[in-house]
């Protein structure tokens, strides 16, 4: 935010360097980050244990926040690839289907001893995920001038304000279980504008925007 508001290229250059190191050397396939419990932070490059993975729920949420801001500053869809991966995997794993038990850390493998808890002595993750989930609609679209960026594919009916129009968009889809997405677009007034559809990286066998993983 500071880099965007002040137009300070030094800030943004530093952010891009840190991001490239994270996306290329320190990102779990789930979109989780932070391999070490000590200091709740990153370890050396490629330190991505399964059983010992820390991947705090709060860190996955922060990864969404960070990549959303990077997208808003650049318009580059690669950042939304990480938003989507972290949201569907690293974040949502942090809460049970019943909504009353939580993971603080999210290892990728367990001998059965790692279970969600009702609360923690340091209960940052339950509150953070409870705050985050109602905000998910804010990540579906973005605008620039007359144009609309469709970043996430979800079953949703939205009214989007651009610089000169209000556009209703209805997405009909079972994504992520099925890839088909139907769009109904209804602008308040006739004018030319673009809807920029994100092509997810995983469609091109690039699940994250680096050479870390391929399938």
Language model features by range: what are they?
Residues 1-215:
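Glycan-recognition and catalytic cores of secretory/periplasmic carbohydrate-active enzymes
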């Amino acid at each position: 935010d500071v880099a965007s508001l002040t137009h300070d290229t030094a800030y943004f250059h530093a952010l891009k360097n840190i991001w490239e190191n994270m996306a290329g050397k320190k990102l779990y396939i789930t979109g989780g980050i932070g391999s070490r419990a000590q200091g709740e932070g990153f370890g050396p490059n490629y330190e991505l244990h399964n059983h010992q993975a820390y991947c705090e729920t709060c860190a996955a949420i922060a990864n969404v926040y960070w990549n959303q801001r990077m997208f808003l500053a650049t318009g580059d869809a690669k950042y939304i690839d990480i938003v989507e991966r972290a949201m569907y995997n690293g974040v949502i794993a942090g809460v049970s289907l019943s909504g009353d038990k939580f993971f603080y850390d999210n290892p990728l493998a367990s001998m059965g001893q790692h279970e969600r808890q009702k609360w923690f002595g340091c209960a940052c993750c339950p509150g953070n995920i409870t705050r985050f989930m109602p905000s998910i609609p804010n990540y579906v679209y973005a605008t620039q001038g007359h144009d609309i960026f469709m970043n996430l594919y979800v079953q949703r009916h939205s009214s989007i304000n651009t610089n000169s129009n209000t556009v209703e968009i209805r997405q009909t889809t079972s994504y992520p279980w099925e890839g088909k997405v139907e769009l109904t677009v209804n602008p308040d007034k006739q004018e030319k504008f673009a809807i920029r559809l994100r092509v997810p990286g995983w469609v091109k066998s690039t699940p994250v925007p680096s050479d870390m993983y391929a399938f």
